[in-house]
């Protein structure tokens, strides 16, 4: 989901908004963003889901994403492996854009009820890209785009720390880049400004 807008979002040190957000604030921020993203998806002939991570039984380590600005803690398991303070960026929420195999546009709640093993494979058009947006507590949206084969699982693009603090052998080496979607970046900054 890239914008055709000619303006550029200034992603600099002044955009670093890092603070600890409550779970209630995270839900509110994500809801505002998903409301905006649903409309964007609908006019673009796509769907969007807020089911950005799903996994079965895993170790007691944290889930993370590699970004061009360092590792982002995607899910804090609460065991301190490696723990909140070890990550420079923390997730406030995330969305996944894809093209449905059905005539469905806008928000899609179905990924949240699909089985972990199925992922997006029964929902997404295999010939179209899947794009994940991660909303960082640094005020930046990070993006990873790939094929259904690459990102079709609910944990595609992420890594996991093992109980001993090492990275799981099947952790993704994908890098989430700073999104060039200027409309999304600007909307995210507007939303965050209400909480900072």
What does each of the following model-derived ranges do?
Residues 3-196:
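Mature, Sec-exported extracytoplasmic domains of Gram-positive
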